[in-house]
From Swiss-Prot:
It catalyses: (8S)-3',8-cyclo-7,8-dihydroguanosine 5'-triphosphate = cyclic pyranopterin phosphate + diphosphate. It is an enzyme of class 4 (lyase). Catalyzes the conversion of (8S)-3',8-cyclo-7,8-dihydroguanosine 5'-triphosphate to cyclic pyranopterin monophosphate (cPMP). This is Cyclic pyranopterin monophosphate synthase. It comes from Campylobacter jejuni subsp. jejuni serotype O:23/36 (strain 81-176).
Length: 157
């Protein structure tokens, strides 16, 4: 399989999407963060010294999706039409699951924007609570689904 981000001399390049059709693109990614009971309670009770953790993580996830092309070298800048987030609590596991869905009308997909949003959102939780629990674990950052473009639809099974 030939990688599209490498030229004939094996040098990195940004893929030319100029001839592609503009289509509706949507992608959803998710990830988990596990923590101590104390850290989980601080977040749930909204008593973190740095402020409202989950609300800040949502804003960070949106910013992370929007800034993807600035931090991942071969990503194209995209005009996003939607970034939607959801956070699920897992009380028994002392964990949160962050889900980010990104949409645009464009010539390339938004998978990296969804994955970046999840990553930055979870890193923000870690940053805001690390004084309480440095052993937090960020895991299972995955693409859940994507639609649009030549490669069609993908849904994680």
């Amino acid at each position: 399989m030939k990688l599209s981000h490498l030229d004939e001399k094996n040098h990195p390049k940004m893929v030319d999407v100029g001839d592609k059709n503009i289509t509706s693109r949507i992608a959803t990614a998710s990830g988990m963060i596990y923590m101590s009971q104390e850290a989980f309670d601080v977040i749930k009770n909204n008593t973190a010294k740095k402020g409202p953790v989950l609300q800040t993580a949502i804003i960070a996830a949106i910013m992370g999706a929007k800034k993807t092309s600035e931090i991942i070298p071969m990503c194209h800048p995209l005009m996003l039409s939607k970034v939607e987030t959801d956070i699920m609590e897992f009380v028994k596991e002392c964990a949160f699951k962050l889900i980010v869905t990104v949409k645009c009308e464009g010539k390339t997909g938004v998978e990296m924007e969804a994955l970046s949003g999840v990553s930055i959102g979870l890193l923000t939780i870690y940053d805001m609570i690390k004084a309480i629990d440095k052993s937090m674990r960020i895991t299972d950052i995955v693409l859940e689904s994507k639609e649009g473009g030549k490669s069609g639809k993908f849904v994680r099974s």
